[in-house]
Amino acid sequence: MMADPLIPWLTEHGLVCHPHTLSGTPISLGSAFQLAGLKLAWRVEIEQRRVWIVLIQRVEQRRGLKNPFAALYMLANAARAVLGPDYYLYGNVDVLAGSSLSTQRLAHFYRRWTGAKELSTGWFSLKVSQVITLSNMKKRQNNGFA
């Protein structure tokens, strides 16, 4: 597997990245970092022009009002800065363990408020140039633009 092109940018922005493997085996699935109580693992697929989100997992108990999308936003910023605006975030939507949010409701959120496309059941793709902050998303919603 080639060196991940996003790691230098993420490191420059204060994140510690490490290899992500299949259940602790030597089989590499990509790279990972932790932010705002979540672990996010991904791999870049240059030929498909996408950043495949391999895993989003809660690593800390829910405390306070942390933005659950901060890690995704950081990954999208890295992809946009390093790879360009025509790359896509790609992954399967499933709720975090212990969440009161249903998978269907989360999928609706991705379709309605982020503009993500559902390529097949549960599999979403969103152009990195379309990713906006949660506060901007709420402003759009409040102004009737979403």
From Swiss-Prot:
Question: What is the gene name?
Answer: lcrR
Q: What is the protein name stated in its UniProt record?
A: Low calcium response locus protein R
| Primary role | Involved in the down-regulation of lcrGVH transcription in the presence or absence of calcium and is necessary for lcrG protein expression in the absence of calcium. Plays an important role in the regulation of the low-calcium response.
What UniProt keywords are attached to this protein's entry? Answer: Calcium, Plasmid
Report the InterPro entries cross-referenced here: LcrR/CesD2 (IPR022797), T3SS_LcrR (IPR013405)
Indicate yes or no for the key word Hydrolase: no
